[in-house]
Design a protein with these regions (language model features):
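Active-site beta-alpha turn of Rossmann-fold NAD(P)-dependent dehydrogenases/reductases
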Residues: 105, 141-144, 194, 206
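A structural motif corresponding to the C-terminal end of an alpha-helix
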Residues: 71-78, 131-137, 186-199
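Phosphate/diphosphate-binding loops
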Residues: 176-190
Length: 239
């Protein structure tokens, strides 16, 4: 609740493992951490079409920001080539002094043909939780979405005049959309881990749009569901 947010104790992030650093939100989490925190940040990513993970991340940081962070690689920015869907890739970090995991990795396409979205958005979360549970001190932060509360209950008799807040998760809402369903299931996994003693936070993010300061938007803007909906409305002359 808001009261818990205002009255709760603020804990330091320490050294962070960040997944999803190549995404629009993830790269800004990385930037804000470097600018405002003192610890190291471990970024698990794939090299993609680039020759190395470092080359890929530097390319993205140069695209979004005017500052040069290349001198921080190897000292404050530690790169781990890996995939959150592979539990063995988390084992590469067994001896690293990680205090907090921030999971910003996800397939955010609202419409997909196969079930790979569940492998990333759900199984990837389970792997991160398993790694976090290997140490009592690790905190786990799950980046979720307000879309888990985006529909009315399919059973309005059981949930009359339902009011939604940050504590609401299941009210028999429509979960046929694979993206929404995957993020819902991920939240369930995180909350289950909390009952087992893991320190967790779930942050539900709204629509990601262009940066307020200068209008910069995500490089792969064509995958943004909200923007595609706006374009569809315009193309159908509903505007």
């Amino acid at each position: 609740t808001l009261e818990n947010f205002l009255d709760g104790e603020k804990s330091k992030l320490g050294n962070v493992l960040l997944t999803g650093a190549t995404g629009f939100l993830g790269i800004h989490i990385l930037y804000e951490f470097i600018k405002n925190e003192e610890g190291k940040i471990y970024c698990m990513l794939r090299k993609g079409k680039f020759d190395s993970c470092e080359e890929r991340l530097i390319d993205l940081m140069n695209y979004y920001f005017d500052e040069d962070f290349s001198n921080l690689f190897g000292s404050r920015i530690i790169l781990i080539e890996g995939d959150i869907t592979e539990i063995d890739d988390f084992k590469k970090l067994e001896d690293e002094p990680i205090d907090t995991i921030i999971n910003a990795a996800a397939i955010v396409k609202h419409y997909t043909a196969d079930d790979y979205i569940f492998k990333v958005n759900v199984d990837g979360v389970i792997n991160g939780i398993k790694f976090a549970q290997t140490r009592k001190s690790i905190k786990y932060v799950q980046i979720s979405t307000i879309s888990v509360l985006s529909s009315y209950s399919l059973n309005e008799k059981a949930y009359p005049n339902q009011k939604y807040n940050e504590r609401t998760l299941y009210y028999e809402q429509d979960l046929t959309n694979k993206y929404i369903c995957s993020k819902f299931l991920a939240e369930r996994m995180v909350l289950e881990a909390a009952t087992q003693g893991l320190s967790v936070k779930i942050i539900r993010v709204g629509n990601l749009m262009s940066r307020y300061s200068d209008g910069m938007f995500q490089k792969n803007y064509d995958t943004n569901a909200f923007l595609n909906n706006i374009k569809a409305i315009k193309n159908l002359n509903f505007s």
